[in-house]
Amino acid sequence: MAATLPLSPINHQLCRFGNNSLTTHRFCSPGFLISSPCFIGLTGMGSATQLRARRSLISSAVATNSLLHDVGATVAVLGGAYALVLSFESLTKRNVIQQSLSRKLVHILSGLLFVLAWPIFSGSTEARYFAAFVPLVNGLRLVINGLSISPNSMLIKSVTREGRAEELLKGPLFYVLALLFSAVFFWRESPIGMISLAMMCGGDGIADIMGRKFGSTKIPYNPRKSWAGSISMFIFGFFISIALLYYYSSLGYLHMNWETTLQRVAMVSMVATVVESLPITDQLDDNISVPLATILAAYLSFGY
C-alpha cells in the first residue's frame, strides 16, 4: 500500500466524504489523490485508468464540438455563396447591371469572400475539407447546369460570357476547382493559396473591368489585352494579396517578415500579370493559367 502523508485540518474536511465518489472527484485534485486518504479504494492503476477515461471523454466532446462547429460554418458559407449568386442573378434579370459586369463581380466577390470566411471554421485537421465542400457543391451545380441536366437560365446568364450553358464547364468550373484546391492543399497556414486566389479573383477580375472601360491601348503581343487591364491586375492583385496576408497574420495564422513579403508578393503579382497577358486564352483559360502560375511563383518565393 502506498504511504500517505499527514493531513491538515483542511485536508480532513475536504476528504472526509471519501466514501462518496462524486464528492471525492470534486474536492480532491490529482495532487490530493497521490498524497492523502482521498485515495481510499483506488490504486495507482485505477487512477491512471480514470484519467485516461476522462481524457477520452474530453477528446470526444472536443471532436463533437468541432464537427458541429464546422457543419454550421459550412452551412453559413454555402448559404452566403448561394445568396451572392442569387442576388446578381436577380440584378441581371432586372437589367440593373450588365451581364458582363455581373459575371465579373461574382468572379471577384465569391472567391475573396470564401477566403475571408476560412477563420470561422474550427482548428481541427478536418476543417479544410468542410470548407472545400462549398466550392464542391457549387462545382456540381455548374456541371448539372452545364450539361443541361437541370438548366438555370439566370445562373447561366450571370456567370457566362455569351449566355451558353456549356460555358459553365470551362472558366466558372475551373474557378471553383481553384477554390477547392487552395482550401484543401494550402488552407490558412500557407500564403500560397491566399495569393493565388487574390490574383485570380481580385487581380484578374478587376483587370477585366478596367480593361473594358479604359483599355483602348492594347498590349503589342496580344490585341485582346490592354495596358490598363494588366496594370490594374498587378496593382489590385498585389494589394489584395497583402490585405489577405495581413488579415491572416493579425489572426495568428501566419507570421510574416513584411519587408521581404512585400518584395515577394510584388514578384508573384508580376508573374501572374505577365501570364494573364499572354495570347493563350483560347488554349488555356485564365482561371487555370493564373492560379497555376501564381502557385508556382509563390512556392518558389515563400517555400510553404
Curated annotation (Swiss-Prot):
One term of GO molecular function: phytol kinase activity
Domain of life of the source: Eukaryota
Location in the cell: Plastid, Chloroplast membrane
Keywords from the named record: Chloroplast, Kinase, Membrane, Plastid, Transferase, Transit peptide, Transmembrane, Transmembrane helix
UniProt organism field: Arabidopsis thaliana
EC number: 2.7.1.182
Protein name stated in the entry: Phytol kinase 1, chloroplastic
Membrane topology per record: Multi-pass membrane protein
GO BP annotations, alphabetical order: vitamin E biosynthetic process
Disruption phenotype: 50% reduction in tocopherol content in leaves. Plants able to grow on soil and to produce fertile seeds. Vte5 and vte6 double mutants can grow photoautotrophically and show a stay-green phenotype with strongly delayed senescence and extended lifetime.
Known role: Kinase involved in the activation and reutilization of phytol from chlorophyll degradation in plant metabolism, including tocopherol biosynthesis. Catalyzes the conversion of phytol to phytol monophosphate (PMP) in the presence of CTP or UTP. No activity with ATP or GTP as phosphoryl donor.
Membrane-spanning residues: 71-91, 105-125, 129-149, 167-187, 191-211, 227-247
Principal cellular location given in the protein's record: plastid
Annotated transit peptide: 1-59
One Gene Ontology cellular component annotation held by this UniProt entry: chloroplast
Functional pathway: Cofactor biosynthesis; tocopherol biosynthesis
Family the entry assigns: Belongs to the polyprenol kinase family.
Catalytic activities: phytol + CTP = phytyl phosphate + CDP + H(+)
